[in-house]
From Swiss-Prot:
Entry protein name: Putative helicase/primase complex protein
Source organism (scientific name): African swine fever virus (isolate Tick/Malawi/Lil 20-1/1983) (ASFV)
Superkingdom field: Viruses
Stretch list, region Disordered: 1031-1057, 1082-1102
UniProt xrefs under SUPFAM superfamilies: P-loop containing nucleoside triphosphate hydrolases
Role of this protein: May be involved in DNA replication.
Gene Ontology terms: biological process: DNA replication
InterPro entries given in the database record: P-loop_NTPase, Replication_origin-bd
Keywords: DNA replication, Early protein
Keyword Glycoprotein attached: no
Induction: Expressed in the early phase of the viral replicative cycle.
């Protein structure tokens, strides 16, 4: 039985469905739209409709189900692919069917992922592909062109109404890749929705909506052919899903925090052996999804799964859990992410259980068999005579002995090649001297003056390569021992004559008849450099896999207290201890701490603070000097080239963090004492989570982007950019140093992002056994911390009370430090004082220890520089343009004269541009805007400007974690981190209002209109921003610490604030010494007083 109507909604003519039926009575009827006859038909039930439909002629079957929004309904998706369009993201696949199917598969996966997050995790409601119904209407359109259309229906579930369906659909659309989003119709959940019925087609088209068994087989979706399963208005047999609009609290918990790219590598390691049957698919919010490659046993369900992508890893807080789509009541804890208190211990457990692959394959291993010699023996085999030989083996297996045999065989007294030129390049002076003792027929560069080219066999350190010259004939043999460290040294910033040194190095590398590279920690950087610059000759890889460290035992912890108390116990038992650390402050702390507790013990202490004379004399005779001591403490000052062979020391205690040198250098430090009686190493690892770009592509993009913005014109309103007509787009010259620099940055960033996992992996890969260091947490740490404060305070006192020197003496001290000449400790403090006074233009003023503590800090200096740069002009936009011009001029000079200056320079324009953009989007006009925003005003701004805004570029620039959620409070927290780093400002909340306020560091360096005598300040040229009359009184009562409110016009004297930012393009000292940076930023200070890229707070590590 049916009734027909011309209209759906009432039009007062009695011809509409609404005229006869109420919404309540329609619940028990089935309504369709007859497109062919332009009518609405109301049936008493679905069965009546199907009987009637079967009797209609094919050309008139143009029926659409009318879905009323207030009624329960199935979740549905309308997918439509336009004709004559390529659907692959990279446009590489010409097979349209495959492209369409690949995209359709991706859409189904995203639907399942959103369902899992929305319903499976909180409510344990599962969705499999067999519960998804897929129909198609593929065929020719009116223009005789092939068109693809699909409907996806979750036929076993229903939602309460169209608003719930709309909310779920929106979540799916948010998580689709941008190139797929347009194919999904977002408007299929209206309050009254027409949805085509199975077996029907559009009027004038022969594309019929139908079941497709072949399609269901491809996508493993439901094989049902039951017509009622395709209807949207649901019968009672479906399961009604919980409401996601009313249960917001349950579905927006912290578990939805997204996984950062830099965290993904750690998360994937927890998959371990699971990846034998699965491969990584993608990340969805806080879920890592996998694609099944073969059947596997599920530890959660305790049975085999042979289809469906069941494996999911979920990250909640710092915990990583394993889930199965078939059972959401249970999960397995896999471990914890780095940057957390127990991550070290958790990760060691994973390594001990062999569920993590510790070996990091390198590109050399992928060379064909004819280009590699791999074996496992306790001593080295003879080296091959090939143009490019690369040797990898652990320490103490005889690499140098076999090299000596190689030289004797091919370059010995009886060899016809004895007159040919050999250059042995090292990365440290002390290593050069060590090598000469083993190769006495070589000339050491430091023992001769003048021309080195006349010597056939020369051992030379990289920073002295300028003493060589290129000739018509290439060198016959170039030896690069510790090759990875040699590449690192070119980024040290210590080269006095960088350009000629690097040019000679590249000339030898490219033209030498034979090259031998040796390193125990060989990596992809060496492979890529050799391929790029010696690609015309094949590489031969000689690898002895023998694990000499298989009897060594490493005990790891993240607890300083446990580590310290183990150390104290061993000292009480009168054991001889070795303590390497990559933190100067930690080394000084340990020295003082041990001296106070064990005054009778003799301590050897070596750092860059040690005098040049002491280092040279002791390192050349460690057998004698280290034989006199009970405890040896050293920083990266001691690395390769210094080796103690005697069995004197019992155990090694290492303390390392990710704020200093890379993992490879730290591991090298462990081997300076070759023989430990106990073969026991106890290591404390600490490191916060960092977010540095870690692929060559990302680093290059980030580097070029910072320079790219220098060529653009700033819009005063929305900080948009266009390219300057005068300068055009920049042209980048990708020189050999550029490629080496990119490779080195990649390694440094990997260490900063994944320091703990890479450290443990590299140790375990040597064959050493790894364990968790256990013990009690006693009160020792309080005394330790107290000593730390004493050391820091004494340093402040020493600087404040040091002699006040002039610029000439400061320059002399600086030159002595660069040239390795011993500088008296008093002069070092005087030089530190001079730099501090010079930085703030504070000469002639008396300073106190408190002044040194506050103003010699990393954050205060960074904020001061930022404030000076942004307040030069009358507006922030004028200031940005001035800074842009200054940095553009430097960049253009550097690209023409000395590229390494450009790559090592810290361009700050882009960081200012982002910071000001964030501030203005919040509704403030500049850094000195005194106005107040109400809570409603700011929240509205944050929603309108940022909820759909991608903050990836900003987080990339400031090395901050991208916000997990884009709600107003999370966005504001992120913005305040940026403003705090750049200017020492924050958007502060008080009594329902928001205004700009100083941070603790920012309050030390106020913006003023005229210089003040009380403290360093920033004389700002920014024109005053007029306060709104309604907020003046509030500002005066709540912002007493903020900006001066004098009415005088800002001084326009640029010379007052142009102190330190003007970087001279001829200065070679752009990079600070990277050695021994403390993990606590207050504890170190760079010698780069000319730049704003100060790394730490306290004293120069030279």
């Amino acid at each position: 039985m049916q009734e027909t109507f011309k209209f759906l909604r009432s039009n007062s003519q009695g011809e509409a469905v609404e005229d006869k039926y109420s919404l309540e009575t329609l619940k028990n009827h089935f309504v369709i739209r007859d497109e062919y006859n332009n009518l609405f038909r109301v049936f008493s039930g679905r069965d009546d409709f199907w009987k009637w439909e079967a009797a209609q002629p094919f050309e008139q079957k143009c029926f659409h189900e009318v879905v009323f929004g207030f009624l329960p309904q199935r979740l549905k998706f309308d997918i439509d692919f336009p004709v004559n369009k390529s659907y692959s993201n990279d446009n590489v696949d010409d097979n349209v069917d495959d492209n369409v199917y690949n995209i359709l598969d991706m859409i189904i996966n995203v639907i399942m992922d959103v369902f899992y997050e929305t319903y499976s995790l909180p409510y344990n409601i599962n969705l499999t592909r067999e519960q998804i119904l897929l129909t198609d209407s593929i065929g020719l359109n009116k223009k005789r062109e092939l068109k693809y259309s699909f409907h996806i229906i979750l036929y076993t579930y229903s939602v309460l109404n169209n608003n719930e369906a709309k909310a779920f659909t929106s979540k799916v659309l948010e998580n689709l890749p941008k190139h797929i989003y347009p194919f999904v119709d977002p408007q299929v959940n209206k309050s009254i929705q027409n949805f085509r019925i199975i077996g029907s087609h559009k009027k004038g088209s022969m594309r019929v909506k139908m079941f497709n068994e072949e399609l269901a087989d491809v996508f493993e979706t439901s094989m049902t052919t039951k017509k009622s399963d395709t209807l949207i208005s649901t019968p009672f047999e479906t399961t009604c899903l919980p409401c996601i609009l009313t249960n917001v609290k349950e579905t927006t918990s912290s578990s939805c925090d997204s996984i950062q790219q830099s965290e993904l590598e750690e998360v994937l390691k927890f998959a371990g052996t699971l990846c034998k049957n699965h491969c990584f698919l993608r990340v969805y919010k806080n879920l890592v999804l996998f694609k099944r490659t073969s059947p596997s046993y599920c530890e959660i369900c305790k049975r085999m799964h042979d289809k469906d992508n069941t494996l999911i890893l979920r990250v909640t807080g710092n915990k990583v859990y394993q889930h199965c789509r078939h059972d959401n009541k249970h999960s397995l804890l896999m471990g914890s992410l780095s940057g957390t208190n127990n991550f070290v211990e958790t990760y060691v457990e994973q390594v001990m259980s062999k569920s993590i692959e510790v070996h990091e394959s390198i590109l050399f291993e992928e060379l064909p068999d004819t280009q590699k010699h791999i074996y496992d023996e306790s001593s080295m085999r003879e080296y091959e005579r090939v143009p490019t030989l690369v040797v990898k083996a652990q320490m103490k297996i005889g690499k140098t002995i076999q090299l000596r045999n190689y030289l004797q065989k091919y370059y010995g007294n009886d060899s016809i090649s004895k007159q040919q030129t050999i250059r042995f390049v090292t990365f440290r002076q002390i290593f050069s001297k060590n090598i000469q003792t083993r190769l006495p027929n070589f000339t050491l560069y430091s023992e001769v003056t003048g021309d080195l080219d006349s010597y056939e066999r020369v051992i030379i350190q990289v920073e002295s390569l300028f003493r060589l010259t290129s000739t018509a004939e290439p060198v016959d043999l170039l030896i690069l021992d510790e090759v990875e460290s040699i590449f690192n040294q070119f980024n040290s910033g210590l080269h006095k004559y960088f350009a000629p040194s690097f040019a000679i190095f590249m000339w030898m590398l490219e033209t030498a008849n034979h090259v031998i590279c040796l390193d125990a920690n060989l990596g992809n950087r060496t492979y890529n450099i050799l391929q790029r610059f010696r690609g015309d000759v094949p590489i031969f890889f000689h690898w002895n896999q023998y694990q000499k460290a298989q009897n060594d035992m490493y005990y790891f912890t993240s607890s300083r207290e446990i580590w310290l108390n183990n150390l104290l116990k061993d000292l009480l038992e009168d054991k001889k201890i070795v303590i390497p650390t990559n933190s100067l402050m930690e080394a000084r702390l340990l020295q003082t701490f041990i001296q106070k507790k064990f005054p009778e013990k003799k301590i050897g202490f070596y750092s860059s603070k040690s005098s040049a004379h002491e280092r040279e004399s002791h390192f050349n005779n460690v057998s004698y000097y280290w034989g006199l001591i009970d405890i040896l403490i050293y920083t990266p000052t001691i690395s390769a080239g210094v080796s103690y062979e005697d069995k004197r020391f019992d155990v090694l205690y290492g303390f390392f963090n990710n704020m200093s040198c890379d993992v490879e250098t730290c591991c090298q430090m462990l081997g300076r004492v070759r023989e430990l009686k106990s073969k026991c190493y106890k290591i404390c690892l600490q490191g916060k989570q960092n977010y540095f770009p870690e692929t060559i592509e990302d680093i290059e993009m980030f580097t070029l982007q910072k320079r790219d913005t220098l060529f653009q014109t700033i819009s005063n309103h929305q900080l948009s950019f266009t390219y300057c007509k005068e300068t055009g787009r920049p042209i980048y010259y990708k020189t050999p140093y550029y490629h080496l620099w990119l490779e080195t940055m990649r390694i440094q960033h990997l260490s900063k992002n994944h320091f703990i996992t890479r450290f443990i992996n590299q140790v375990a890969d040597t064959g050493a056994k790894v364990f968790i260091l256990t013990g009690e947490k006693l009160e020792t740490v309080k005394q330790y911390t107290s000593i730390k404060m004493e050391i820091k305070h004494q340093d402040y006192v020493n600087v404040a009370s040091a002699e006040t020197i002039d610029a000439n003496k400061a320059l002399q001290i600086k030159q002595n430090l660069k040239e390795g000449i011993t500088v008296d400790q008093r002069d070092l403090f005087a030089y530190e004082k001079y730099k501090l006074l010079e930085f703030y233009a504070w000469h002639g003023n008396k300073i106190t220890p408190k002044f040194v503590e506050q103003y010699n800090s990393f954050m205060t200096k960074q904020n001061y520089t930022g404030r000076v740069q942004i307040s030069r002009g009358k507006t922030v936009y004028e200031s940005l343009t001035m800074l842009q011009t200054q940095e553009l001029n430097f960049h253009q000079w550097a690209m023409q004269h000395a590229e390494h200056h450009d790559l090592q320079f810290n361009y700050s324009f882009q960081s200012h541009m982002y910071a000001i953009m964030l501030l203005t989007k919040c509704g403030f006009k500049c850094v000195q805007d005194p106005n107040i925003l109400t809570n409603e005003q700011l929240m509205t701004k944050l929603v309108d400007e940022f909820v759909q805004y991608d903050l990836s570029a900003v987080s990339f620039e400031f090395k901050l974690k991208k916000p997990n959620k884009m709600d107003p409070q999370t966005i504001l927290k992120f913005i305040n981190k940026v403003l705090g780093l750049r200017y020492g400002l924050k958007i502060h909340h008080n009594k329902g209002n928001y205004y700009i306020k100083n941070t603790k560091a920012g309050s030390l360096i106020p913006f003023v209109r005229q210089p003040i005598k009380q403290s360093p300040c920033v004389v700002s040229n920014l024109l005053p921003i007029t306060e709104s009359s309604s907020t003046k009184e509030e500002i005066s009562s709540t912002k007493e610490e903020t900006y001066s409110t004098k009415e005088e016009t800002y001084s326009t004297k640029e010379e007052t604030c142009s102190i330190k930012e003007e970087i001279s393009p001829i200065k070679e000292e752009t990079c600070s010494i990277k050695e021994e940076i403390s993990p606590i930023k207050e504890e170190t200070c760079s010698i780069k007083e000319e730049t704003s890229s100060i790394k730490e707070e306290t004293f120069t590590e030279t």
